């Protein structure tokens, strides 16, 4: 997890990059949970490394920063298009409720809330 819950501790970038390199060499996927990344004071995401590491998958959720527990709404980022197609093929037909979709749209319109929260 990056940052860790409940401590908020972040992995050192050099350590994380080393893990990514070793896993890349061994053809191992790395799933990085960044659901709490918006609470960090400065940019600490590794999202800019997606194009370098096709084995990197980043998971984020709306539920943490927008304080909407129970609303199952999140997303995954990955640069491996073939893998994304495989993942999409495993999703249920109705993987997003109408309520969660409406909540997500409303959240994306609340930039002022984000500034106040962080």
Each model region followed by its residue ranges:
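Active-site pre-lysine segment of PLP-dependent enzymes
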Residues: 6-65
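PLP-dependent aminotransferase class I/II
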Residues: 55-118
């Amino acid at each position: 997890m990056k940052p860790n819950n409940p401590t908020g501790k972040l992995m050192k970038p050099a350590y994380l990059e080393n893990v990514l390199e070793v896993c890349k060499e061994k053809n191992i996927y790395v799933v990085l949970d960044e659901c709490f990344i918006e609470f960090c004071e400065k940019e600490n995401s590794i999202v800019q490394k997606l194009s370098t590491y096709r084995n990197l998958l980043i998971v984020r959720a709306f539920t943490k920063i927008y304080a909407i527990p129970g609303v199952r709404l999140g997303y995954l980022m990955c640069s491996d298009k073939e893998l994304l197609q495989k993942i999409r093929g495993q999703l249920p037909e109705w993987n997003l409720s109408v309520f969660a979709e409406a909540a997500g749209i409303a959240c994306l319109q609340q930039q002022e809330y984000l500034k106040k929260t962080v």
